[in-house]
């Protein structure tokens, strides 16, 4: 063996030994990230996630899947995803301070007559998280991509374009969307 071969082998051995430390450091950083943001995940993505402000919706839609990927949520049993069998979808909260915030709220079950609900036949209601709603594109064919989920996904854009509609053709399109997505009501002008 000549000097160059010995030097090359020494460099390879040093690099091979340095790599596990880097992996350990990344795992430690990942663990710290998971611990640090667990409360945020439970607040915005977990079973008890409340309504999400529209300003945060985009960030939450990216955060929830990233946290689940890096922190092995569901596999390790940290947080179980909600039951997707229920058709009820809670859309994002409208911006506060808006004069029209209460005019485009989803129709709630409380508005239905009391005799329709019975304790024996009432379906179990579950909210879809922002991360799940973000995946419900119009082309989605997954089991959780119900019409209600797709409506909740497209509602912010529809609300922006339809209030007020820019033309008669757009008004007709908006009317068709609101008739399909009955959980939302259009702003009345």
UniProtKB/Swiss-Prot annotation:
InterPro entries: Notch_signaling_modulators. Disruption phenotype: RNAi-mediated knockdown causes moderately abnormal vulval development. RNAi-mediated knockdown causes defects in octanol response. The keyword ATP-binding does not apply. One of its GO terms (molecular function) is Notch binding. Keywords: Cell membrane, Developmental protein, Membrane, Notch signaling pathway, Signal. It is a peripheral membrane protein. GO terms for biological process: cell fate specification; Notch signaling pathway; positive regulation of Notch signaling pathway; regulation of gene expression; response to osmotic stress; vulval development. Residues 1-18 form the signal peptide. The keyword Zinc-finger does not apply. One of its GO terms (cellular component) is apical plasma membrane. May interact with lin-12/Notch receptor. This is Notch ligand osm-11. The lineage of its organism: Eukaryota, Metazoa, Ecdysozoa, Nematoda, Chromadorea.
């Amino acid at each position: 063996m000549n000097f160059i071969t010995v030097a090359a082998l020494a460099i390879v051995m040093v690099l091979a030994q340095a790599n596990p430390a880097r992996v350990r450091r990344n795992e430690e950083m990942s663990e710290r990230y998971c611990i640090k943001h667990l409360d945020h995940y439970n607040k915005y993505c977990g079973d008890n996630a409340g309504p999400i402000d529209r300003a945060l919706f985009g960030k939450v839609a990216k955060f929830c899947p990233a946290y689940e990927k890096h922190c092995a949520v569901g596999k390790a049993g940290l947080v179980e995803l909600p039951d997707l069998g229920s058709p009820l979808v809670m859309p994002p909260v409208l911006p506060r301070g808006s004069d029209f915030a209460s005019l485009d709220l989803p129709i709630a079950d409380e508005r239905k007559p009391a005799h329709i609900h019975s304790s024996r036949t009432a379906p179990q209601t579950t909210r879809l998280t922002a991360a799940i709603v973000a995946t419900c594109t119009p082309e989605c064919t997954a089991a959780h991509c119900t019409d209600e989920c797709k409506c909740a996904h497209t509602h912010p854009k529809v609300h922006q374009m339809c209030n007020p509609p820019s033309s008669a053709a757009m008004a007709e399109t908006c009317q068709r969307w609101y008739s399909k997505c009955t959980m939302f009501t259009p702003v009345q002008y």
